[in-house]
């Protein structure tokens, strides 16, 4: 038998290593967008918050069915989708789409693909109520002091992503002692794009002592559009404040809606929140309530109507 040990031949190329997990297109977009936003951030406190949030997301990773908290919510289709920041769309078509979701008798502010749209919004607010957004330098310090103080990101990966990637903050302030009769309607509308769009709406509601207000959030989008909306809302109710909060989720049936709601109540305050989930293809609501003051209370109600392939999952924690 011939001895082949001495025969010199070029080594065979090693077979390619199998990836540990399928490529995650969404995470690639998240990472690139985080780098862009971090580089453009002008607020030192928000820059630190974004960096901390991204660190928490990287530590937790993209959720899978193997994790106890996610065993009923398969978000793999989200991970396989390549998202982009949405581009501008036709104004007439946009206005018609938004009009279908307006609520009569409310003061409406409209956000399109996560960005405030002054042309579609009310120009005057009731006395005792102010709303600013993150690009407005005025009042930014007050917003920064509260932003991220309620919404936990250490065990909630999409809350972490949303904190790292939000573009504009709807900062709602109810003045101490103010009783605002007209409901404020924040309408977040997502548009159809050639490449699925992604937006990360952020809302911060601060109700001063002995104040009272009703806040309505609506999430909707173009019919049959594929997109990701990943909102986080924080409600801070000071002593004896009363906040009635409503959320209507009426996204496209092809959309992904992964949301977080966190609230904190001070002494004698009351927050009631009512969530109605009617749209979306894959929907997840994470709710955190922290009763931080003696005699405070929170009412957490929810209703969802799904059929066919729709998935809606709600997780709640009360401390």
Where are these regions (language model features)?
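N-terminal leader/transition segments
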Residues: 1-201, 208-212, 218-219
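Conserved beta-strand/loop scaffold segments within soluble protein domains that form the structured core
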Residues: 3-7, 11, 52, 138-319
């Amino acid at each position: 038998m011939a001895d082949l040990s001495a025969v010199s031949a070029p080594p065979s190329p090693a077979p390619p290593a199998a990836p540990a997990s399928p490529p995650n297109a969404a995470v690639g977009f998240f990472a690139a967008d985080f780098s862009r936003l971090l580089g453009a951030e002008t607020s030192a406190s928000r820059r630190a918050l974004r960096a901390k949030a991204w660190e928490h997301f990287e530590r937790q990773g993209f959720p899978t069915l193997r994790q106890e908290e996610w065993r009923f919510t398969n978000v793999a289709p989200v991970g396989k989708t390549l998202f982009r920041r949405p581009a501008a769309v036709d104004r007439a078509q946009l206005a018609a789409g938004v009009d279908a979701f307006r609520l009569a008798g409310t003061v409406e502010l409209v956000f399109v693909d996560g960005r405030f749209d002054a042309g579609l919004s009310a120009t005057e607010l009731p006395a005792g109520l102010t709303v600013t957004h993150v690009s407005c330098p005025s009042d930014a310090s007050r917003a920064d002091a509260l932003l991220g103080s309620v919404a936990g990101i250490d065990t909630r990966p999409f809350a972490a992503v949303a904190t790292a990637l939000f573009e504009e903050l709807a900062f709602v302030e109810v003045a101490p002692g103010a009783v605002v009769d007209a409901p404020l309607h924040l309408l977040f509308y997502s548009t159809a794009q050639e490449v699925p769009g992604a937006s990360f709406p952020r809302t911060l509601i601060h109700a001063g002592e002995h104040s009272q207000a009703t806040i309505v959030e609506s999430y909707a989008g173009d019919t049959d559009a594929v997109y990701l909306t990943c909102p986080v809302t924080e409600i801070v109710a000071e002593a004896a404040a009363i906040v009635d909060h409503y959320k209507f989720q009426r996204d496209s049936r092809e959309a992904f809606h992964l949301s977080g709601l966190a609230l904190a109540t001070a002494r004698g305050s009351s927050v009631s929140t009512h969530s109605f989930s009617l749209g979306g293809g894959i929907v997840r609501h994470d709710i955190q309530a922290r009763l931080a003051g003696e005699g405070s209370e929170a009412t957490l109600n929810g209703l969802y109507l799904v059929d066919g392939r729709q998935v809606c999952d709600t997780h709640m924690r009360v401390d």
